[in-house]
Amino acid sequence: MKLHTAVHTAIVAAAAFAALAGCSMMPASLGGWTALVDGGKGLENFDRIGNSNWRVEEGAIVADRNPDKTPSYLVTRTSYTNFVIKAEFWASADANSGIFSRCKEPKNVGDETCYEANIYDQRPDPSYGTGAIVKVAKVDPMPKAGGKWNTYEITMNGPHLQVVLNGQKTVDIQDSKLSAGPVALQHGTGTIKFRKVEIRPL
């Protein structure tokens, strides 16, 4: 009986150790980062607004069709104040997309209610196109993201807002219009793929 108990205790202890070791290796918790999108995983982390055909395809979360012709969003269920977002995305040349932050109205996402780091190479006014924060911080010249994989790093720390696209700083300003809220991923037109999106609170 004692031997059985000892063996059982050892098995439970080993299982607990293995579980802890496994958790410590999870990318979602490494260095304070939380994975919102990790390859084809992550749709469950968002609420959907609109009718774009968000789906998992070839290791990414993808949308390329919107029957309503109005922007659609994946909106986090968590609100964030100060943070860094890192994202890997692919956009077609005609894509209209973006990463929205500090959305004060989670059910009414837009460039008036959020900070939008734009992904829109063909925007009629390119000063607020790809790399800009729409209606807040312009870019000149506008970088292009279409037809390739790109990286975005978006930092919001109090009024300090910074955007880095493919290693190039495109925005570095002070603005206090919005202070906290969810993060949202947009599909408007064209094809957008998110392979990685992670966030770390500051």
How should these model regions be labeled?
Residues 10-21:
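Bacterial N-terminal signal peptides
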